[in-house]
A protein has these predicted regions:
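Bacterial signal peptide processing site
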Residues: 24-27
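C-terminal motif of bacterial Sec signal peptides marking the signal peptidase cleavage site
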Residues: 18-22
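A compositional/structural signature for long, glycine/proline-rich flexible linkers
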Residues: 30-426
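Bacterial N-terminal signal peptides that target proteins for export
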Residues: 1-11
């Protein structure tokens, strides 16, 4: 019996030694590391009403930013457990400009040996991944040793790198409730030298991500009756490069409501459908043009809609004198089998700066991982620049059939229209 215990103890010791993470030093030196939550920023919450540039309310973000120019001989290793969420990605940004230059989304992250990627195949239990961030100019021989499919590269000329994690709709492991960290610990960050020996992790320096905001400006077209939707260009505001956005903007009035109807993209119901889905997720998000923060949103599974059917979205000021009647009308329409979603915008709500969020709103229709080959995909449209010194978005339209969503996508493209209270209630 004693011999059996000794054998089992030795076997367990071997297994533990073999399962030490690949990012550890192979010459026996151990470098103390803080816990992952100490390595990453505090949670940047999409629904925290703090972040600018119209974030999605259903997404949490974390950043780790470091000086790439001062650590050009270091490889970063991110090792963690796949989170329990609808969508997960790692993006790399030039923190001096906000431009995205690399990244990897959940379904393309290889699972560690013995694990399964839960964004590819339905699975249970804990599943792990490893991602390496290598400096520009890293020899291919080093990349080959790491496994090229696990490597993301720092672009030439980028001096300061912001690594951002995104979790959409994170839950506990059993999916029963919302969870800030999607039921897992954040990935641990370690560092290797070019000989793949463990070395010190670069200092986490202050990032510009938390400070980002889109430009605040006025537009004459905000007063127009129609609010067209445009495809957003890839911007300098730390965008998710795996996401496409339609945007529109208008001034809400007390004597009318803003409405738009279209057929939303169908979404997959299980991981096995993710790869061939026309989009992973969609949401409608409403933000204030006065501070570029998001305040209201609804995502696919919470919206009133059905695949292949038109859904209607109505935005009404809280101070609209006919609000009660408008609410009753929407309830009646839904009772009659329509798919109508009502947003009540409180223009007098104070933001964190103590200012009212106002009556001018930006409306975003967001698609994650849109399939450009799908004939109704918003990603097929031609992007339209935001307001600049040459004019407003509507002034940048040179090809309406490719730039205006309702023309480019037909029933799958929204067009906002201000409808008088009386006409809406007829």
């Amino acid at each position: 019996m004693r011999i059996k215990q000794i054998i089992m103890t030795s076997l367990l010791s071997c297994i533990m030694a073999m399962t030490v993470i690949a990012c550890s030093d192979d010459d026996g030196k151990k470098i103390p590391a803080p816990s992952p939550k100490e390595q990453w920023s505090a949670t940047l919450k999409g629904d925290g009403e703090v972040l600018g540039a119209y974030p999605d309310l259903y997404c949490n973000y974390w950043e780790y930013t470091y000086r790439a120019d001062e650590n050009s001989d270091k490889i970063l290793c991110l090792k963690g457990e796949f989170p329990h969420c609808r969508y997960f990605s790692v993006s790399l940004y030039n923190d001096e400009t906000g431009d995205v230059f690399s990244g990897i989304n959940d379904q393309d992250i290889p699972a560690d040996k013995g694990s399964t990627n839960p964004f590819v195949k339905t699975t249970s239990g804990k599943n792990y991944f490893t991602i390496y961030v290598v400096p520009n100019g890293t020899p291919q021989s080093v990349i080959d040793k790491l496994g090229s499919e696990k490597v993301v590269k720092v672009a030439k000329g980028v001096n300061k790198v912001a690594i951002a994690l995104r979790h959409y709709l994170g839950t506990t492991a059993d999916g029963s409730q919302k969870d800030e960290y999607a039921g897992v610990e954040l990935p641990a960050i370690t560092a290797l030298d070019m000989d793949l020996h463990e070395t010190s992790v670069p200092e986490h320096v202050a990032s510009n991500i938390a400070k980002v905001t889109s430009k605040v400006f006025t537009q004459k077209s905000d007063e127009n009756k129609e609010m067209p939707f445009f495809l957003a260009p890839v911007s300098m505001y730390y965008p998710n490069s795996f996401t496409a956005y339609l945007y529109g903007r208008t001034h809400l009035r007390e004597d009318s409501v803003l409405t738009f109807s279209f057929i939303p993209a169908p979404v997959p119901t299980k991981p096995e459908e993710y790869k061939d889905a026309v989009t992973r997720y969609w949401s409608i998000c409403i933000g204030s043009a006065s501070d570029t923060r998001s305040y209201m949103s609804i995502y696919d599974k919470k919206a009133r809609y059905a695949d292949g059917k038109k859904a209607t979205f109505v935005i009404c000021l809280k101070k609209n004198p006919k609000l009660a009647a408008i609410q009753s009308k929407v309830n009646e329409m839904n009772a009659n089998g329509e798919y109508v979603n009502l947003f009540i915008w409180d223009s007098e709500k104070k933001n964190i700066d103590g200012n009212p969020i106002g009556e001018v709103v930006a409306v975003m229709y967001r698609n994650i991982l849109p399939d450009k080959d799908w004939e109704h995909s918003i990603a097929r449209m031609t992007p339209t620049a935001y307001k600049d010194d040459k004019g407003e978005p509507i002034d940048h339209v040179t090809d309406p059939d490719e730039q205006l969503a309702h023309k480019a996508l037909g029933d799958y493209g929204p067009l906002g229209v201000k409808v008088s209270n009386d006409d809406f209630l007829k």
